[in-house]
Amino acid sequence: MVKHDSEVELSEEDFYMQRVSMVRKEMKEGASMYPHKFQISHSFQEILQEIEKTSTQFVGEDVVRSAGRIMSMRLHARFCFFVVTSNGESLQVVVDTKEAGREQMAKFLRRGDVVGFTGNPGRTRTLEASVFATDIIVLTPCLRTIPTEHFGLKDPETIYRKRYMDLLINRESRNRFQKRAQIIGYIRSFLDSRGFLEVETPMMNLIPGGAAAKPFITHHNELKLDLYMRVSPELYLKKLVVGGLERVYEIGKQFRNEGIDLTHNPEFTSCEFYMAYADYNDLMEMTEELISGMVENMFGTDTIVYSPKKREERTESVELSFKRPFRVISILEELNARLGLDLSGETLDREETLEKLLSACDKEGLSVEKPRTLSRVLDKLIGHVIEPQCVNPTFVKDHPIAMSPLAKNHRSKAGLTERFELFINCKEICNAYTELNNPFEQRERFLQQTQDLNAGDDEAMMNDEDFCTALEYGLPPTGGWGIGIDRLVMYLTDAANIRDVIFFPTMKPE
């Protein structure tokens, strides 16, 4: 139920019908309810800055024209007081209803209406920063009720489906998306300042290469063929490095036809960069510089408290230290130490090694879905043994070749690759490696991936002969790096769910 100026309670549907009737009546009588334009002379921020210069009651001589949305209204004696918002700022607009023509307009206006006003800035007797309106008009009437900021939106489904309503009344939500833009801007500036070129690559591909993930399939009517929505821009970006663009990056959407949970959404935003003449050691240093510098820039400190809210229920807080250097964990060394194994890169591809790993999974109570490939079994053990240790930013490095089909062999550790993942709060944020640039080795890796794919591993990569051909022209020694922006935003904005940092997350139809 909602209450209006007449103090009569109306249901949402009754309010809608009444409001539609009022607007239609005004339009029928020739009133312009949806004007094309309203010329603004001052933003709310500029008006408030001018008012701040005087701390006593006053009405200025300057005339301002501005506009915003009515978020609350009250009638007191002959005056109607509107709290109007614009771009996150709030301003009181005072209308003297006894002045000619204003009483009828004041009666028509409702909470949620977008209005334009002209008047003099000043302060009321209670010293409230205000504009004393000489004219106020409707720019867009609001036909439906908007929840009050006090009660807010409780239902997550409504929040995600009607983000516009969430943004109207939830200051925390607006701030979170502003910080998201700040984070993306910081990454872009960081790379631009180091000579990287921002590029765009196709989102529809013949082969879904670049990551171990299940793709979405679409169909191109004109070409009469199925295409895959990209799971990563990696292979295209490396082709650009082959073409002589030695430092490139792309910020954009990826699509993975997988599960939805607190930290996964099928459509997500990533940044990937590729840097000729760099290796994964250089990228670890750059990652520390980027992430630690970003946190320092946003919060003025390298230590923050991640305190997520699940709606009104606050979950346990976690202190995260981004102080350099970050902790480093070598995968096989840690698995051996924690599980009492004797794994080595040279023997990882043996059948008895897989049996040892499956036995370790059984002892730890872990179930591995078929097909039980070496990559899947190792991934399960890493998730169980290593990832829970990675609360503060931690590099997990030197992945086995079976887990890293596009990464270069480790220069001193047989069977391993020069790859790392950065974990924060036990979740992967970054993935990077010294790029495999040997076309002979790359073909062999793709062949193994094809075998895994045929065995039922729907996350294995397809063979990309065009990419191998590009490698034959010569990919310089290159470091490649990717970051999941949505997860990073979660941890820097106290979001409990990845859907809280995506304007319009993937949802089932109502």
Curated annotation (Swiss-Prot):
Gene3D superfamilies: Bira Bifunctional Protein, Domain 2, Nucleic acid-binding proteins. Transmembrane segments: none annotated. Its EC number is 6.1.1.6. Its main location: cytoplasm. It is found in: Cytoplasm. InterPro entries: Aa-tRNA-synt_II, aa-tRNA-synth_II, aa-tRNA-synth_II/BPL/LPL, Lys-tRNA-ligase_II, Lys-tRNA-ligase_II_bac/euk, Lys-tRNA-ligase_II_N, Lys-tRNA-synth_II_C, NA-bd_OB-fold. It catalyses: tRNA(Lys) + L-lysine + ATP = L-lysyl-tRNA(Lys) + AMP + diphosphate. One of its GO terms (cellular component) is cytosol. SUPFAM superfamilies: Class II aaRS and biotin synthetases, Nucleic acid-binding proteins. One of its GO terms (molecular function) is lysine-tRNA ligase activity. Keywords: Aminoacyl-tRNA synthetase, ATP-binding, Cytoplasm, Ligase, Nucleotide-binding, Protein biosynthesis. GO terms for biological process: lysyl-tRNA aminoacylation. It comes from the Eukaryota. Homodimer. PANTHER family: LYSINE--TRNA LIGASE (PTHR42918:SF9), LYSYL-TRNA SYNTHETASE (PTHR42918). Belongs to the class-II aminoacyl-tRNA synthetase family. This is Probable lysine--tRNA ligase, cytoplasmic. It comes from Encephalitozoon cuniculi (strain GB-M1) (Microsporidian parasite). The lineage of its organism: Eukaryota, Fungi, Fungi incertae sedis, Microsporidia, Unikaryonidae.
